[in-house]
């Protein structure tokens, strides 16, 4: 917070931190060819992902947002108003499965250059979405990049959207993320 890198809500304790430059990081990630090809995404409900939700919906991408009150449920949203979580209940359609989703964007607390993602340790998406087998991406401020990570990652991401750029994470020959 002393560096003025954290954004609302403050303090960032207890949730994935929002950060200054999140909109630029979202724009960079959405413009990356690996992400731009997806027309339906699962996107976390974290404040740091609000700019990504808004930009994606404005570009015609369909989003599935996790229902914060019913575990395992999503809201299918195609209206820009649904980028705001309070409005997603009004404009979204409740779904048990994210039908047609081809990738996911999850928030992080920290991420390593190799794609290891640390979450807040609980809640939706804390350990990624392994059961769905989808490529996963994240947004981060440069101060959230740690090498090495202080503990084993919760999950792995293929791309890290940073303000103004995207970092590609190494993959194995089979396309799965390198451990």
Where are the model-predicted features located?
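A short acidic, amphipathic alpha-helical/loop segment
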Residues: 51-56
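Alpha-helix N-cap/helix-start and coil->helix boundary motif
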Residues: 49-50, 125
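Structural motif
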Residues: 43-47
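Surface-exposed, charge/polar-rich loops and edge strands
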Residues: 1-20, 24-39, 58-62, 71-179
